[in-house]
From Swiss-Prot:
Residues 1-29 are annotated as: Disordered. The keyword Iron applies. One of its GO terms (molecular function) is manganese ion transmembrane transporter activity. Keywords: Ion transport, Iron, Iron transport, Membrane, Transmembrane, Transmembrane helix, Transport, Vacuole. Residues 1-36, 87-134, 179-190 are cytoplasmic. This is Vacuolar iron transporter homolog 4. It catalyses: Fe(2+)(in) = Fe(2+)(out). It is found in: Vacuole membrane. Probable vacuolar iron transporter that may be involved in the regulation of iron distribution throughout the plant. Its main location: membrane. It comes from Oryza sativa subsp. japonica. GO terms for cellular component: membrane; vacuolar membrane.
Amino acid sequence: MAATNGDAELTVAEEAKEEEEATDDGGGGVSSQWLRAAVLGASDGLVSTAALMLGIGAARPADARAVLLSGLAGLVAGACSMAIGEYVSVHVQLDVELADLERRRRRGGPAPAGLGLHAAAAAVSRPGQAAAASALSFAAGAALPLLAAWFVAGAYRVRVVVVVATASLALAAFGAAGARLGRAPGGRAGLRVVVGGLLAMAATYGVMKLFRTHGV
């Protein structure tokens, strides 16, 4: 008899739990994966929102309101995009693994040992939870440069310095934290993340500055 969808989901979850217990000592458990995903989501939100604010500021340096509203719009849009993408991804991954499990059982073969922690642990019957986690991590990262600029009263150059400094410090912390979760040295990883974020912000700022210079 073919396995029902509920039985298949239960089996996938049980196998994921066994794999988690086997790999937890090596830093590859589900908890570590969730934390690393949260760090990546926060870094994504931080870089994209800071770059967006700097870009709008380069085009309209005298309009502080436009800069803040662009950051807020980036936070909301990015969080929604992350949530929807994670929700769809989780369902697709789960459907693929459940279909593979059922095909193996119909052929009378053994169930695969370790179907994938992402779909099994994070998505079985809880795609909404995975979507919410992605949205919240993105929003948390995006809120940092937005709040930094919000509470700064001064010239545009001052806001730029504050946003870049806040983003750099936070990126260094996120990069180091992600490396530590994988039991790797955090210093070099943090530096790489900071350099990447600064390049993204500089590119956005430069392009928008070019458009403003040419009167576009």
